[in-house]
Amino acid sequence: MAKQPTALIILDGFANRESEHGNAVKQAHKPNFDRYYSKYPTTQIEASGLDVGLPEGQMGNSEVGHMNIGAGRIVYQSLTRINKSIADGDFFENDVLNNAVQHVNEHDSALHVFGLLSDGGVHSHYQHLFALLELAKQKGLDKVYVHAFLDGRDVDQKSALKYIEETEAKFKSLGVGEFASISGRYYAMDRDKRWDREQKAYNAIRNFEGPAYASAKEGVEANYANDLTDEFVEPFIVEGQNNGINDGDAVIFFNFRPDRAAQLSEVFTNKAFDGFKVEQVKDLFYATFTKYNDNVDTEVVFEKVDLTNTIGEVAQNNNLKQLRIAETEKYPHVTYFMSGGRNEEFEGERRRLIDSPKVATYDLKPEMSAYEVKDALLEELDKGDLDLIILNFANPDMVGHSGMLEPTIKAIEAVDECLGEVVDKILDMNGYAIITADHGNSDQVLTDDDQPMTTHTTNPVPVIVTKEGVTLRETGRLGDLAPTLLDLLNVGQPSDMTGESLIKH
């Protein structure tokens, strides 16, 4: 006899917003979604900011969203986790940071601090540099040299002087720290093995070689005069007490996002490095805020938090058969991120990957591979052995990123057609579906003055639970979806899954 499946259907980038202007969700003809919405219990939940472990007011995204959904709790992202540790004071007790200080004291050497100097919050945050300066002050260090990388991508193209001035004011108020070198991120944060770029940054940092200026401000202004924006500022050195990185020194790299910090760290820490000629620093203590990759041998300030008892693991522990299904664009989200950063399948889990169409941009094919995803799912349902299904329709998000209203409306209409077939089939099997989203996007693809808006939104996302006779809580967050699934599956919720079922009892 066929099982009664419970499905989580994620309409990626589909949120609630009152205004119809630029709102593809409101303007699309979606009879199936509307039918379920009027027939079954509904609510809306938060998918951004503190509710998903991001700083207040920060829009959610698919990685963060799926991680919170799968974990069934708030998953604190690196930026928030570090901010919290600074606010709590734990930062100043951190073993790795204090080992760096001890190393400097034992060797009567210098502390060098690397990182992206901005408040973009994508790779780093300059307030974390300020916390490191506070730590150096508390511990009585006097030789602290900052090697700043300029942003101009996640913040305004020419905003570096603001951050430089604030940092210099911090040096002055604490009586510790000075700029040693400055590089545009184009050089210091390359990730494609363009060693000619990285070498210029390395020479300024390690060997104290390059154009020299009396101050960071003077060097940046000289680059501006050559029509270079922050990202492309050529590595230069700032005249002062620093003379490069020497034997026995310590480095702390405060970028928390690994991809653009790994390469430079590899130059310093990988003895087999051969991208260009380097002279290894002897007895160098090298710490990074997070683990960058396996080629980078460093002390790690904030170790990765392993997420246990995610929805997939709980399903496995209860001998449930589960399916993860999406097209290429969102396949990592329903697998790796939904499983808390785990690539391997759980026991009883199978996966279906449907290729996304090969087009330059998805506004050219708004239906993407939704119909193929739907067909594959119907095929899987026919096997009759599934307990849990996690499905993602990518269209509202991927087409929404075009900032084009008509294609985004078409994308939602295609998804609605597929939704109808999938949900009706699940209902025919006496199963249940939760229809929801991971963050907003297609709910606003135009600004108030009709310019394309390509970013996500912070609007709440809808939840429909296709079970008559139950009442849903009025509010919640993405971390409440896994507990709701377990509730529908009649499976106990583990204690580390701290979200709450949206179904009132």
UniProtKB/Swiss-Prot annotation:
Binding, Mn(2+) 2: D12, S62, D438, H439
Enzymatic reactions: (2R)-2-phosphoglycerate = (2R)-3-phosphoglycerate
The protein's enzyme class: isomerase
Catalytic site: S62
GO annotation, biological process: glucose catabolic process; glycolytic process
Molecular-function annotations in GO: manganese ion binding; phosphoglycerate mutase activity
InterPro entries: Alkaline_phosphatase_core_sf, BPG-indep_PGM_N, Metalloenzyme, PGAM_B_sf, Pgm_bpd_ind
Cofactor: Mn(2+)
Cofactor note (record): Binds 2 manganese ions per subunit.
Entry GO CC: cytosol
UniProt binding sites for substrate: H123, R153, D154, R185, R191, R257, P258, D259, R260, K330
Pathway named in the protein's UniProt entry: Carbohydrate degradation; glycolysis; pyruvate from D-glyceraldehyde 3-phosphate: step 3/5
Alphabetical UniProt keywords: Glycolysis, Isomerase, Manganese, Metal-binding
Binding site for Mn(2+) 1: D397, H401, H456
EC number: 5.4.2.12
Subunit structure: Monomer.
Function: Catalyzes the interconversion of 2-phosphoglycerate and 3-phosphoglycerate.
PANTHER family (UniProt xref): 2,3-BISPHOSPHOGLYCERATE-INDEPENDENT PHOSPHOGLYCERATE MUTASE
Family to which the UniProt record says this protein belongs: Belongs to the BPG-independent phosphoglycerate mutase family.
Protein name from the UniProt record: 2,3-bisphosphoglycerate-independent phosphoglycerate mutase
Lineage: Bacteria, Bacillati, Bacillota, Bacilli, Bacillales
Gene from which the chain derives: gpmI
